[in-house]
């Protein structure tokens, strides 16, 4: 299961690659000592079914974790433009995941991670293979295998991590049952991450990643290397000031070299019954067009203007400044100003669906994020966040499908000695625009959830998504789910 989700804003190129324009860092749970796991089953509207199981064990010499899940839904008609078939567009996904760790000594850990994902998806609006006529009988199959082996070693003030990663991805598209487009992709990388604890307050982080990717769609068969090297200095001065400064150099076989940087700082100040934190980051990034984007523009289903577009690299720069306060009474407040710019942005043609296009100039997103959380009492918690996002594409128009105002309000209530858990979340979207600049309709979506522990480790749970049955579109002509109820049973041991 997931233990923690951390969202990192802006360019994060040092350790995550120069093309990381933001990172969602998901930390999975490590098994406690001994044996543990869970099984669950749920179902609901649209013929939705999900079964999942996981088991893990941990001791002084190692740990193991295995999980599997199977999800399927009949779905609903995905596009309003589908007025002939009007069929449900379903989705199926089966995922297997395994993690094995061995600690032969206190200073050495060896790890192995494997993952297999298979998915099938039905959708609308594609073209027939023989006549290139529009059709809504469309589907695609997705199959990915990935694995990683790693070794972590500590020696005094030094730590080292060496890892080998490989993934193979196959994807095939169908129109009216006939194969229309297929790709086979591979990604192989070797990475090294090292650190030196120079003093109690100063750490040096350094590393390299050597990556080779390839794609074959039957007519486009290419391979590309990209090597990256980085260095970061992390300092903590007294118990109040923390700073980082880093630089990264990337060498892309097709698009040349690029140097990026990232700086960050945080200052802590006691205030009232809590702590005030001032923080800020600034950084740059670089992204070469992917082999898939290049292959698509050169394929049979691309047409002008995308087929006439020779994609080049895009560059980004961004910064954010924020202040946060954590109080002893369970109150948390945060405000952040952000500004991110992308030069020569690569994007899919959402107006004509011709393929991938590239902006000429800078695209910008800037604004304010506000967040608050309050534990009103031992069994009641409230949370809220709001984003004002002022966007501008390279041609001066607003960036499409991005709400200028987006807010969430959440409530969690745990009565009955926490055996019963109740939750609600309201999502509000305002002032997004279509590809032609016309405004999209504003909407509010309310979700509720509940769970009850029947016995120790055994819980029944349920949720209703879109409780008020809001009829809305996040992307024009694409339907969204109406009111949908789901219920399930979970056992933890």
Predicted segment positions?
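A beta-strand signature from Gram-negative outer-membrane beta-barrel systems
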Residues: 1-36
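Non-catalytic regulatory/gating segments with a bias toward low-complexity or hydrophobic composition
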Residues: 5, 24-26, 66, 280, ...
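Periplasmic-side early beta-strands and strand-to-turn transitions of outer-membrane beta-barrels
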Residues: 14, 25, 32-35, 40-42, ...
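Conserved C-terminal beta-signal and adjacent last beta-strands/turns
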Residues: 54-58, 67, 103-105, 110, ...
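Membrane-embedded beta-barrel scaffold of Gram-negative outer-membrane proteins
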Residues: 62, 68, 73, 152-175, ...
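Face-selective signature of the C-terminal outer-membrane beta-barrel domain
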Residues: 101-119, 139-273, 331-337, 381-383
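Surface-exposed extracellular loop regions of Gram-negative outer-membrane beta-barrel proteins
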Residues: 118-120, 126-129, 219-222, 253-258, ...
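Gram-negative outer-membrane beta-barrel transporters
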Residues: 236-243, 333, 338-341, 359-435, ...
């Amino acid at each position: 299961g997931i233990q923690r989700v951390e969202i990192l804003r802006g360019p994060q190129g040092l350790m995550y690659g120069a093309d990381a324009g933001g990172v969602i860092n998901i930390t999975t749970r490590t098994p406690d000592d001994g044996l543990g796991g869970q099984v669950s089953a749920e179902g609901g509207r649209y013929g939705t079914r999900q079964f999942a199981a996981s088991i893990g064990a941990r001791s002084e010499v190692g740990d193991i974790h295995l999980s599997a899940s199977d999800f399927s839904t009949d779905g609903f008609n995905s596009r309003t433009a589908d007025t002939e078939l009007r069929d449900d567009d379903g989705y199926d996904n089966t995922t297997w995941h395994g993690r094995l760790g061995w600690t032969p000594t206190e200073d050495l850990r060896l790890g192995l991670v494997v993952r297999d994902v298979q998915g099938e998806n039905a959708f609308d609006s594609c073209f027939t293979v023989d006549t290139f006529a529009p059709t809504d009988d469309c589907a695609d199959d997705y199959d990915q295998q990935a694995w990683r082996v790693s070794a972590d070693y500590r020696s005094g003030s030094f730590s080292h991590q060496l890892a080998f990663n490989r993934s193979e991805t196959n994807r095939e598209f169908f129109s009216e049952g006939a194969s229309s487009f297929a790709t086979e992709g591979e990604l192989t990388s070797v990475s090294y991450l090292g650190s030196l604890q120079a003093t109690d307050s100063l750490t040096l982080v350094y590393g390299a990643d050597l990556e080779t990717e390839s794609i074959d769609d039957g007519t486009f068969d290419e391979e590309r290397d990209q090597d990256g090297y980085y260095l970061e200095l992390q300092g903590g001065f007294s118990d109040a000031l923390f700073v980082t400064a880093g630089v990264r150099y990337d060498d892309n076989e097709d698009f040349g070299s690029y140097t990026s940087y990232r700086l960050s700082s945080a200052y802590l100040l006691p205030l009232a019954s809590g702590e005030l934190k001032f923080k800020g980051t600034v950084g740059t990034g670089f992204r070469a067009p992917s082999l898939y984007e290049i292959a698509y523009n050169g394929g049979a289903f691309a047409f002008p203007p995308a087929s006439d577009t020779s994609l080049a690299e895009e560059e980004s720069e961004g910064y954010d400044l924020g202040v946060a306060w954590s109080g002893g009474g369970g109150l948390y407040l945060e405000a952040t100003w952000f500004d991110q710019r992308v030069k020569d942005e690569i994007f899919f043609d959402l107006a004509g669906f011709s393929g991938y296009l590239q902006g000429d100039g800078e695209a910008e997103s800037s604004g304010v994020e506000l967040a608050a959380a309050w534990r009103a009492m031992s069994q009641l918690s409230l949370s809220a966040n709001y984003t004002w996002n002022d966007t501008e594409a390279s041609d001066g128009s607003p960036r499409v499908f991005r709400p200028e105002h987006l807010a969430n309000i959440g409530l969690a209530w745990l009565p009955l000695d926490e055996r019963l858990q109740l939750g609600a979340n309201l999502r509000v979207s305002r002032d997004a625009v279509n590809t032609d600049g016309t405004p999209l309709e504003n909407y509010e979506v309310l979700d509720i959830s509940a769970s009850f522990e029947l016995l120790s480790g055994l819980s029944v749970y349920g949720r209703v998504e879109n409780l008020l049955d809001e009829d809305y579109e996040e992307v024009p002509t694409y339907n969204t789910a109406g009111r949908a109820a789901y219920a399930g049973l979970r056992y933890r041991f």
